[in-house]
Amino acid sequence: MRNSLKNIFLIVFVSIISLGLYQYYQNYSEARSFNNFLDSAALVSSLHLEASEEFKNLLDFSEISREEFENKIDKVVSNSKEAYEIINNTDASLTLKEKELLSLATSYWLQGLEMFEVSIITLIDNPNSEKIQESIAQSISDLSIGDRSYSEFLFLTKQNATSEGTFLPVLYEIEYVGLEDNSFRFADLLVEKAKSSTGGLFLVRNLSISGAEFKPNPIAITEEDYSVLL
């Protein structure tokens, strides 16, 4: 009888220890995966902080040339693509609401920035383009969705970062256009700003004068049939 009780006690004790060790491993594994995700999120945040600040400067349009605009928007889109790749290369088995929100943000940001770049270049090449405001408005709408998704990601991440074993890196507040209620009005304002630019935004690149031909008109004809030029 004593041996039976002793064996039962031993089995219960071993089971409790095993369960505790398993739970500890599970918590450790989840914390490590979450920390790895946060490291990637910090890179994404840093890239989009730089891109969003440059993008806001571009929206001024006041004294920027076409070449400067193209170089800067290329850098902004490049940063966005890099951030998109980083978040999509994270552990596919990781199912987190935070990851879902950040993935949504990077996707809409990239989509909006690429459409914005194409739309403004189209406007520059053809200032009388019809319905250009629609594509610009769509890009603004996409950027706004990205801003909102990132804001929710940031809130949720900070809320859950209090868990034991979680190390919260620097995650920046990022906003491209904010919560824009009227993207079409925003687009109209951007088109007006762009068209009033004084920095050479609408100058055509790689356009040069290869030669000039002087064809003066005569102002009089002499009796000897010679033309008198001014």
What is each of the regions a protein language model found here?
Residues 1-13:
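N-terminal Sec-pathway targeting helices
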Residues 14-39:
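Transmembrane signal-anchor/signal-peptide helices with a preference for the extracytoplasmic
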Residues 26-30, 61, 122:
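Perimembrane helix-loop junctions in membrane proteins
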Residues 31-38, 45, 179-191, 212:
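Intrinsically disordered, low-complexity Ser/Thr/Pro-rich tracts
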Residues 39-121, 131-153:
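Alpha-helical segments in soluble extracytoplasmic regions
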Residues 123-127:
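Solvent-exposed N-terminal domain segments of exported/luminal and surface proteins
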Residues 140-184:
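Membrane-inserting hydrophobic helices used for pore formation or membrane fusion
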Residues 184-228:
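Low-complexity, acidic Ser/Thr/Pro/Gly-rich terminal tails and inter-domain linkers that flank the onset
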